[in-house]
Amino acid sequence: MRKFSDQKGLHYVLAFILTFGYALSVMATVANGQDFVTIKDAWVRPTNPGQEVGAAYMTFLSAQDATLIGVESDVTKSVEIHNMSMENGVMKMRMMEKLPLVAGKPYKLAPGGFHLMLFDLKKPLNIGDQVNFALTFKSKNKHEFKQNIKVMVQSPAEASTTK
């Protein structure tokens, strides 16, 4: 009789371990962003010597509703999400705290619209340079994850032909 209850207890422990392990693997997939947000057509505009501000552009495609809540880069002290819009014949630029992404809908950051502003550049950005970004997203389930990408500095003409 005792042997049966020991085996039954072992089954419960094993079931718990397997369930817990599966839950951790699902959380790890969300946490590292694998296949969660796809980033394509990314490029950074080159700057002139002495220029302290730059811009980056890319297209996001999220597998589920998510929000871009932060961006860091190795070439600048701060990165902000900005939007440009025409109001009463005047072009205005506004900082956005976050950028909502709708599942399955591409979201394009492009000149004249949404883009990433790179402030206090540490060095000029020359054509051919690589810029590292760490993008922080929050899923609809409130899971946060970072996605690291390397982006090439290109002229607008080059960027439009490499897509």
Which residues fall in each region the model found?
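Bacterial N-terminal signal peptides
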Residues: 12-25
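A general marker of short, structured functional hotspots
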Residues: 8, 16-18, 133
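N-terminal secretory signal peptides that target proteins for export/translocation
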Residues: 1-9
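Compact, glycine-rich, soluble single-domain proteins
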Residues: 30-163
